[in-house]
């Protein structure tokens, strides 16, 4: 693969492509600010330096770049055989995904897959570990097939059922509603579910921004633009990952709806 195929962040190009008519009216200082908060230069240097690393090796390079360390609890709860669905809270939006994939990837010899936004497929090193999903646009009709392919594979599945990273509500930092997909698909594929708790939090600025946008009725996820900045704020830290006991897929019977079972598992995660 040549260097030409390497994905690099280019804020100017993104703005020209996504907003061609408005681009010439965007002040240069705004473009410079966006480059700063997404850490364009630093991340591009890393992507270039790690361009030959794939899969779990790429995640390890990410861990080193972020100087992230992980303390693992409940390692005895990780099954040696069988296929499972690992579901975790999503406090950070960066280190949590990287660290969880790294820990499980090393434990299961690289046989792990994330269900992720298809935009992350642009990261060449991460792509081999991803099942791309897109609920909007032309690919929306293929969403069920994409999810099905992941669960029918011989890889361990890693999911963040909230989709978005945690928000602060009534003073408590916690995931928003967990989607029921992991319950339905785990039953169909007869995969037990392993609850995972990842310790960590973003800055007060991030939570305040998300809440202000919500209060103003702004639908665009502005807080998402700051996730790279939050990732850099969380460098040089040690995070605790706790694995709970596997929950047999037969547990998820008709006594609750899939959405209620998803909430049930979420509650278990926050008690770990």
From Swiss-Prot:
It catalyses: a lyso-glycine lipid + a fatty acyl-[ACP] = a glycine lipid + holo-[ACP]; N-[(3R)-3-hydroxyhexadecanoyl]-glycine + hexadecanoyl-[ACP] = N-[(3R)-3-(hexadecanoyloxy)hexadecanoyl]-glycine + holo-[ACP]. Pathway: Lipid metabolism. SUPFAM superfamilies: Glycerol-3-phosphate (1)-acyltransferase. Pfam families: Acyltransf_2. Keywords: Acyltransferase, Lipid biosynthesis, Lipid metabolism, Transferase. InterPro entries: ACT14924-like_Acyltransf_dom. It is an enzyme of class 2 (transferase). It comes from the Bacteria. The keyword Lipid biosynthesis applies. Induction: Is constitutively expressed. Its EC number is 2.3.1.-. One of its GO terms (biological process) is lipid metabolic process. GO terms for molecular function: acyltransferase activity. Belongs to the O-acyltransferase GlsA family. Is involved in the production of glycine lipids (GL), which are phosphorus-free membrane lipids important for fitness during growth of the human gut bacterium B.thetaiotaomicron in vivo and in vitro. Catalyzes the second step of GL biosynthesis, i.e. the O-acylation of the hydroxyl group of lyso-glycine lipids, resulting in the production of the mature diacylated glycine lipids. This is Lyso-glycine lipid O-acyltransferase.
């Amino acid at each position: 693969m040549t260097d030409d195929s390497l994905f690099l962040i280019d804020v100017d190009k993104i703005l020209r492509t996504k907003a061609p008519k408005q681009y010439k009216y965007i002040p240069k200082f705004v473009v410079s600010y966006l480059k700063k908060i997404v850490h364009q230069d630093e991340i591009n240097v890393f992507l270039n330096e790690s361009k030959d690393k794939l899969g779990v090796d790429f995640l390890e390079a990410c861990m080193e770049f972020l100087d992230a360390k992980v303390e693992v609890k409940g390692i005895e709860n990780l099954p040696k055989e069988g296929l499972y669905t690992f579901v975790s809270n999503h406090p950070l939006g960066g280190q949590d995904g990287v660290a969880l994939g790294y820990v499980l990837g090393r434990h299961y010899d690289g046989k792990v897959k994330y269900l992720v936004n298809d935009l992350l497929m642009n990261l060449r090193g991460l792509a081999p570990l991803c099942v791309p999903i897109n609920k909007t646009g032309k690919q929306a009709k293929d969403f069920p097939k994409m999810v099905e392919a992941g669960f029918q594979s011989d890889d361990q599945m890693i999911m963040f059922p909230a989709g978005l990273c945690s928000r602060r509500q009534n003073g408590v930092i916690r995931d928003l509603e967990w989607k029921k997909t992991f319950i339905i698909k785990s039953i169909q594929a007869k995969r037990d579910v392993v609850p995972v708790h990842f310790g960590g939090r973003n800055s007060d600025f991030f939570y305040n921004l998300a809440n202000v946008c919500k209060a103003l009725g702004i639908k665009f996820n502005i807080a998402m633009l700051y996730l790279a900045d939050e990732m850099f704020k969380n460098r040089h830290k040690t995070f605790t990952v706790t694995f709970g006991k596997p929950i047999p897929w037969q547990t998820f019977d008709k006594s609750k709806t899939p959405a209620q079972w998803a909430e049930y598992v979420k509650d278990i995660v926050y008690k770990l």
